[in-house]
Amino acid sequence: MNYFNLFNFTPSFDIDTGLLAERYRELQKAVHPDKFANDSEQQKLLAVQRTAQVNDGYHTLKQPLRRAEHLLSLGGVDLSHETTTIKDTVFLMQQMDWREALEDIKHSKQPQEQIDELYDSFSAHEKLLFSQLSHLLQTQDEVAYLKAADQVRKLKFMAKLQQELTNIEDALLD
């Protein structure tokens, strides 16, 4: 299903999330199962299915990484059963540095300072990756979409790193 069509958006990475929320509320009102309480079982089931589609579509378009994956899938690049690895050696080296920094936090006398530095580093890198991703997805050609898929892979890795850092910080607070 094309969630951009469902929410009446032109397929694009950069969308107005305020307008998305507004259209979500409108669609929820239109398809809410309570509106079909006196209808046939088939109509009730359809209302439940439509509500699920609206919810899934909203959460997909609301989150930039999921939105990018959806846009790529519409363009023929499916990342749902991803097995491709990142081949960017500069990024892989940076990844190793970040992993070492995460490990160093556990043995640090000033862990919060290192945590803050890593959050800043992750945030800056994610911002750059999202900017590049947005540019690539505007091009809408096969080569750009394959490069965009690499950006999505990197951003997924960054999300995992962010989660690991959050877990380390939470463990230090316990």
Curated annotation (Swiss-Prot):
GO terms for cellular component: iron-sulfur cluster transfer complex. InterPro entries: DnaJ_domain, HscB, HscB_C_sf, HscB_oligo_C, J_dom_sf. One of its GO terms (molecular function) is protein-folding chaperone binding. Pfam families: HSCB_C. Residues 2-74 form the J domain. SUPFAM superfamilies: Chaperone J-domain, HSC20 (HSCB), C-terminal oligomerisation domain. GO terms for biological process: [2Fe-2S] cluster assembly; protein complex oligomerization; protein folding. Keywords: Chaperone. Co-chaperone involved in the maturation of iron-sulfur cluster-containing proteins. Seems to help targeting proteins to be folded toward HscA. Interacts with HscA and stimulates its ATPase activity. NCBIfam families: hscB, PRK05014.1. Belongs to the HscB family. This is Co-chaperone protein HscB homolog. It comes from Shewanella denitrificans (strain OS217 / ATCC BAA-1090 / DSM 15013). The gene is hscB.
